[in-house]
């Protein structure tokens, strides 16, 4: 299990707000053989956590990302993976820069290190230059996950637009009655909105059958992306984070928990919709330039069955993974 971390913020970074813990002096630990506190105090000595550079080597590491947003991003990614899969062994692969070329190298390094699941909490607007690095995200035998973005319905995000990548959108949870105890809708608030889009570069894969997008549609699946508390010392303690940078590592962790990482990809989700909660409410129309319109189409509005903001739905156990 790996998460890639550039050293400065691009599009899909988690957005932080101050949050007060009811018991800030008591770090929370997760059950399982590989335990981390919410501030990631798991050490390399345990064998459960390590970090390497974009070549997969323990040194030299890039300069600290403190103050750039990526210190929080790394905390968030590792915390969400370990929440979903407490026994997963985690490797953070650090890129030298937030450019497409450096980021592409991190996935290759993760694959060479034997990671079964690779989580990418970043994205950029798709274009020809970004797509020139697509081969770096094609690794048979490895499940690759990427966040769909935090600015709602717009141009598809790279690398989430690739057919080899599980694209993850975002939802909001609220307390409700009933057996589940929650109601769920598309994430869209004053901080941002889960990404969705229709690729102008990547062909429609055979396993996607939505009708209003001729290319690859983002997203495939989704998870909670709002109001998640994380402890980060460089931010002075507990903060509340929003973004599909929450959702992507959660989904990656669920793949790790299921134990099928490396043998499944985005296409397998479409054959296991009964193991997903269908999200049917909400829109991700957040920031749309004049050239981008959606109306009430499934590309930006949740509805029964597949829709782009939440994909096929959110995990109901591990059956789809």
Predicted feature locations:
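Walker A/P-loop NTP-binding active-site region of P-loop NTPases
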Residues: 254
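Phosphate/diphosphate-binding glycine-rich loops and adjacent basic-rich segments that engage nucleotide
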Residues: 178-194
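Substrate-binding/charge-relay-adjacent region of secreted/lumenal peptidase catalytic domains
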Residues: 1-170, 192-242, 248, 259-265, ...
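Intrinsically disordered, low-complexity segments enriched in Ser/Pro/Gly/Ala and basic residues
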Residues: 118, 184, 195-198, 273-274, ...
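An often Trp-containing, charged/polar helix-loop segment at the C-terminal end
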Residues: 259-308, 312
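Short acidic, Gly/Pro-enriched loop/turn segments at secondary-structure junctions
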Residues: 100, 174-180
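Secretory-pathway extracellular proteins and peptide precursors enriched for disulfide-bonded cysteines
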Residues: 189-191, 198, 205, 283-294
């Amino acid at each position: 299990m790996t998460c890639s971390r550039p050293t400065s913020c691009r599009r899909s970074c988690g957005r932080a707000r101050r949050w007060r813990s009811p018991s800030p002096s008591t770090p929370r630990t997760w059950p399982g053989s590989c335990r981390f506190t919410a501030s990631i105090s798991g050490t390399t000595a345990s064998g459960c956590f390590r970090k390497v550079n974009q070549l997969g080597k323990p040194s030299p590491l890039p300069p600290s990302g403190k103050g750039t947003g990526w210190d929080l991003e790394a905390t968030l990614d590792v915390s969400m993976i370990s929440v979903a899969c407490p026994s997963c062994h985690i490797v953070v692969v650090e890129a030298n820069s937030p450019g497409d070329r450096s980021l592409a190298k991190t996935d290759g390094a993760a694959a060479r290190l034997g990671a079964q699941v690779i989580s990418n909490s970043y994205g950029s607007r798709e274009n020809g230059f970004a797509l020139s690095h697509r081969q770096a995200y094609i690794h048979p035998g490895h499940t690759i996950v990427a966040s769909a973005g935090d600015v709602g319905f717009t141009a598809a995000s790279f690398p989430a637009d690739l057919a080899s990548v599980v694209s993850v959108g975002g939802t909001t949870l609220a307390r409700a009655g009933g057996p589940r105890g929650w109601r769920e809708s598309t994430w869209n608030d004053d901080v941002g909105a889960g990404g969705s889009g229709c690729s102008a570069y990547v062909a429609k894969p055979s396993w996607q059958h939505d009708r209003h997008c001729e290319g690859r549609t983002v997203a495939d699946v989704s998870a909670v992306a709002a109001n998640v508390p994380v402890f980060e010392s460089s931010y002075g303690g507990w903060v509340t984070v929003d973004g599909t940078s929450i959702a992507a590592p959660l989904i990656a962790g669920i793949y790790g928990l299921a134990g099928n990482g490396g043998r499944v990809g985005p296409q397998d989700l479409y054959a296991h919709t009964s193991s997903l909660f269908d999200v049917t409410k909400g829109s991700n129309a957040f920031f749309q330039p004049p050239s981008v319109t959606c109306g009430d189409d499934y590309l930006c509005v949740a509805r029964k069955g597949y829709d782009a903001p939440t994909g096929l739905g959110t995990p109901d156990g591990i059956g789809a993974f």
